[in-house]
C-alpha cells in the first residue's frame, strides 16, 4: 500500500492516469528516507526541514498544507495501511512536479508519494563482507545541486551495476576534481589516529540527516578530532579505518579498500554512542 497526495492506493499502477503520467513525465525531484520505530518518526524535524530546503533549491511549489503535522499524518497512514505501526520500518517520501513549468506558470504544484517497508536498524556494528573500490567512469556534480538525493541518481545506478558485476560491497564516488565525495550507500568517514575526516558538502556529497548526526556524535566524543575537508583516493589507503554512514545501517565498517584491510575500532565506539542517542530520540 502507498499514499499518493493524501489518498491510499494498493499499488503505484492503481494511481489515476493523470497523476501517473505526471510521475512518469516529470520524474522524482526529491527523495527522503526516514526511520520509524513503533510509530515514532526518528529525527523527523531534521528530515522535514531538509525536504523543504531541497524543494526551495529546485524552485518547487510548496503547498500550504505541507506542514510537519500533515506529512506526519500521511506517514502514519501508510504505516497503518501496511500493518507497520508497531514495527521498525523505513519510510520513503518522494516529491515531484505535477506539471511542466511554463512561461505563465513557472512554479508548478508538487505531488508526493510515500512508501514503507519493514526494516530494523542493526543492534551491532555492521561490517562489510567484501572490499570497496573507486568508481572512475563518471563524476559527481559538485556544489549545492549535488547535495540533493536525486541529483546524481543515474550515475549511482550505473555505479551499482559496476559494483554488482565486479563483486564489490560498495563504490566510492569522486567529483570532477578527483576528490572523494561519498559512497553509493552513504557518507564515508576516514579515521587516522584520533582524527576522523569526511568530505565537505561542497564536494557534492549528499547532505543527509544521518551524516550530520554522526558528525555531532564525533564532535561530542572526547579524544576524537573531527575535520570536514577534501579527501583524495590516496588518503583512503593511508587510513586506519573507514566507515560509511546511512539511514539503513547507521554506521557500517569497511572491510577492505584495495589491498588495505581495516579493523573497526573508532567505528565500534561511535556506533555504540549513536545507537544510544537513536533509542533516546
Where are the model-predicted features located?
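Short, acidic/charged, Gly/Pro-enriched secondary-structure junctions
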Residues: 69-102
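Helix-start/capping segments and mature chain N-termini
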Residues: 1-77, 105-281
Amino acid at each position: 500500500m502507498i499514499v499518493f497526495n493524501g489518498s491510499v492506493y494498493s499499488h503505484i499502477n492503481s494511481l489515476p492516469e493523470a497523476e501517473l503520467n505526471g510521475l512518469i513525465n516529470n520524474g522524482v525531484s526529491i527523495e527522503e528516507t526516514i526511520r520509524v520505530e513503533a510509530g515514532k518518526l526518528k529525527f523527523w524535524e531534521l528530515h522535514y526541514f531538509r525536504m523543504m530546503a531541497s524543494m526551495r533549491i529546485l524552485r518547487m511549489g510548496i503547498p500550504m498544507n505541507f506542514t510537519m503535522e500533515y506529512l506526519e499524518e500521511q506517514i502514519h497512514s501508510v504505516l497503518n495501511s501496511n500493518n507497520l505501526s508497531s514495527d521498525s520500518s523505513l519510510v520513503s517520501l518522494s516529491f515531484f512536479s505535477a506539471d511542466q513549468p511554463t512561461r505563465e506558470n513557472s512554479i508548478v504544484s508538487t505531488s508526493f508519494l510515500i512508501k514503507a517497508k519493514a526494516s530494523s536498524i542493526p543492534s551491532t556494528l555492521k561490517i562489510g563482507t567484501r572490499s570497496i573500490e573507486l568508481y572512475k567512469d563518471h563524476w559527481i556534480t559538485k556544489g549545492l545541486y549535488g547535495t540533493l538525493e536525486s541529483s546524481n541518481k543515474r550515475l549511482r545506478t550505473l555505479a551499482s551495476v559496476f559494483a554488482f558485476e565486479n563483486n564489490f560491497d560498495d563504490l566510492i564516488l569522486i567529483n570532477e576534481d578527483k576528490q572523494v565525495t561519498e559512497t553509493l550507500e552513504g557518507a564515508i568517514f576516514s579515521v587516522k589516529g584520533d582524527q576522523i575526516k569526511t568530505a565537505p558538502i561542497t564536494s557534492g556529497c549528499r547532505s543527509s540527516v544521518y551524516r550530520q548526526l554522526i558528525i555531532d556524535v564525533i564532535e561530542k566524543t572526547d579524544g576524537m578530532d573531527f575535520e570536514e575537508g577534501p579527501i583524495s583516493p590516496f588518503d583512503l589507503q593511508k587510513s586506519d579505518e573507514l566507515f560509511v554512514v546511512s539511514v539503513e545501517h547507521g554506521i557500517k565498517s569497511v572491510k577492505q579498500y584495495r589491498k588495505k584491510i581495516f579493523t573497526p575500532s573508532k567505528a565500534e565506539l561511535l556506533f555504540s554512542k549513536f545507537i544510544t542517542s537513536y533509542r533516546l530520540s
